[in-house]
Structures are given as C-alpha cells and as structure tokens.
Amino acid sequence: MSRIANTFAKTKKENRAALIAFLTAGDPSIEATPALLDSLVENGVDIIELGMPFSDPMADGPAIQKANLRALAAKTGYNDIFRIATEFRKRHPETPLILMGYANPMTFKGSDSFAASAKEAGVDGIICVDIPPEEDATLGVAVREKGMDMIRLATPTSDEARLKIILDGASGFLYYVSVAGVTGLQQATEASIDAALDRIKAVTDLPVAVGFGIRSPEQAAAIAKKADAVVVGSAFVSCIEKAVTNRQDPNAALEKLAKELSTAISDARKEAAL
C-alpha cells in the first residue's frame, strides 16, 4: 500500500480522523521550512500538504496569500521545493507528503518533468487547485504513471453527476472544500458537512478529507466525528506570520496548535460514543 493508504488504514484502526496540515514551502524562509515541517509531524500531524508558492493563488484567503508572498520574497524556487521534499522524506520515511498548488508552478517545465521530480523527491500525491478533471489531459496522467495519487477536490455545489467526473482518476483521498470561496475565511455548519459526507460516501470508497475554514480544536473535533481527515492550513500559516511579526519562535507556535488539534481530533469519536 501507499503511504497515504497506510495512514488512513492506521487512523481507521485507531477510530480517529487523520490530521492534515498545510504549509507554504519557503515561508518564512527556505531554511526555516524543514524544522517547521518536523514540528508538525512530531506533534500529531498525519499528512503534510506542502504548498508551492505562486504569485496569484486565487483559491486562497489572505493568510495563505501572504504566505505565498513571503515565500516568493525569500526567493523560493521550483528546485527548492523538491529539495525540501527530498530532505523531508529522509527524516520522515512513513509520513505522506503532498504537493499542493496551481498549474502554473507545477507544469511550466512540463507535466512529465514535474511528476518525475516529485516522485524522485518522495512525494506521495498531488493536489492541483485550478485544473478541473475534464481539462486534465496531461498532469493527472503523468502523476498516475509515476505511482503517485492525484487528489481531487469537491465542493458544496458538486452534485452526483459532477462527483462522478471528479472521482474518475482520483486516488488517495477526496478533498471536500466545505465552503464556497477562498481558504480560511468561513466555516460551513456541522450539519451541512455531515450531509455532504453522506452524499459523497455514497458514491466512493475513497477517504474524504474536509478543509477550508477550520481554525480551532473545537471546529476540528466536530468535523472529525464523521470525516476521514481534517485539513488545517490558514490557522498554521497564521501562526507563522504572528510569530515572525512578534519575533517569536514559529516552531513553538506550530507545536502548540498541532498538539491541540491532534488531541481534539483523537478524542472526538470517543466523546461522541459516550
């Protein structure tokens, strides 16, 4: 099994959701990123999403937009991202690593070249935000040919017909974007997420991860009762920004939030069963 499949098998056996954390590569610097990733893994994060910096991150809210700008200001380039991934894989041989971003930084050297570099660096899956399935004639094919997962996104407006298109060629897990709009600004109601999960799980056996707008342990725990994974991005990125602004250690801030989220997610189903 793949590292992603192994992780979901493990969390299922432990009767808990997985915690997926997003950080932007190179934020606040290329040199700082490896230790920040270590802080997440060592404090309960199960899967890492590493964002590829881009100048026009249209699906992202203010926190991640600013993280992209900080990473670009730090001159984080294509090769830096794969170097960070390669080093991560050496330190964490079992933790899934996903590259997440936009078509432009992923494919400007060609889909085959990108997929080959990702595979060589130990990447497990790819999330490309702005290539819809029906327009994905090259990237998804290249990713799958290298044995990596092409992870698709579904939204509240994805009906059954649309879900079938999204799921065609999808693997690893399905990422459910729980609100319409950009990351980090809103949160869907628990009832609407539960209904969406029922609808999605009726048409796929893939694990379903829920993200967008999850900022607190309480929000994460509510979603973890039913979702297979909880994705947190803007909250972690905001921790980095706040720590850097206040000249504090961003690792300590990430460790604290990761522990709180991990504990809340691990306890969610135990409390629901009482």
Swiss-Prot record:
Record-linked Gene3D superfamilies: Aldolase class I
Alphabetized GO MF terms: tryptophan synthase activity
Cystine residue pairs: none
Catalytic site positions: 49 (proton acceptor), 60 (proton acceptor)
Enzyme category, top tier: lyase
Catalysed reactions, as listed in the record: (1S,2R)-1-C-(indol-3-yl)glycerol 3-phosphate + L-serine = D-glyceraldehyde 3-phosphate + L-tryptophan + H2O
Source superkingdom: Bacteria
One Gene Ontology CC term in the entry: cytosol
InterPro entries: Aldolase_TIM (IPR013785), RibuloseP-bd_barrel (IPR011060), Trp_synthase_alpha_AS (IPR018204), Trp_synthase_suA (IPR002028)
Function as written in the Swiss-Prot or TrEMBL entry: The alpha subunit is responsible for the aldol cleavage of indoleglycerol phosphate to indole and glyceraldehyde 3-phosphate.
Quaternary structure, from the entry: Tetramer of two alpha and two beta chains.
UniProt family annotation: Belongs to the TrpA family.
Protein name: Tryptophan synthase alpha chain
